């Protein structure tokens, strides 16, 4: 089972536990702006993700508004990952919280 956490809790996990934040939004939106340090998780990048993240590493899933990330978080749990989180409010919530982002502009 995955846990839902606030954007602030996600940022804290990234700092304190070196959690990996994966962004599942489309390529164009991810390239335009994303949470600082986010990994763009797609069907094509899943193999790279598996190499980078161990099953017990903390992984945080982010999408647009916090809905789609739940499905991906559940999928990762089914694949054997133990420490999975979904951001409440997604990237929109991350931005509203004023947390660090990286942009293409």
UniProtKB/Swiss-Prot annotation:
EC number: 2.8.1.1
Keyword list, A-Z: Cytoplasm, Transferase
PANTHER family referenced in this protein's UniProt entry, alphabetically: FAD-DEPENDENT OXIDOREDUCTASE, THIOSULFATE SULFURTRANSFERASE GLPE
Stated role: Transferase that catalyzes the transfer of sulfur from thiosulfate to thiophilic acceptors such as cyanide or dithiols. May function in a CysM-independent thiosulfate assimilation pathway by catalyzing the conversion of thiosulfate to sulfite, which can then be used for L-cysteine biosynthesis.
Annotated catalysed reactions: thiosulfate + hydrogen cyanide = thiocyanate + sulfite + 2 H(+); thiosulfate + [thioredoxin]-dithiol = [thioredoxin]-disulfide + hydrogen sulfide + sulfite + 2 H(+)
Species this chain originates from: Mannheimia succiniciproducens (strain KCTC 0769BP / MBEL55E)
UniProt record, GO biological process: glycerol metabolic process
Active site, per annotation: 63 (cysteine persulfide intermediate)
Protein name (database record): Thiosulfate sulfurtransferase GlpE
């Amino acid at each position: 089972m995955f846990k839902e956490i606030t954007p602030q809790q996600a940022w804290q996990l990234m700092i304190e536990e070196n959690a990996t934040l994966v962004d599942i939004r489309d390529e164009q939106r991810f390239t335009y702006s994303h949470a600082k340090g986010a990994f763009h998780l797609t069907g094509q990048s899943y193999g790279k993700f598996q190499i980078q993240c161990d099953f017990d590493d903390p992984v945080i899933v982010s999408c647009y508004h916090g809905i789609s990330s739940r499905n991906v978080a559940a999928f990762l749990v089914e694949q054997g990952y133990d420490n999975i989180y979904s951001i409440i409010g997604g990237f929109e919530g991350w931005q509203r919280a004023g947390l660090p982002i990286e942009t293409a502009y």
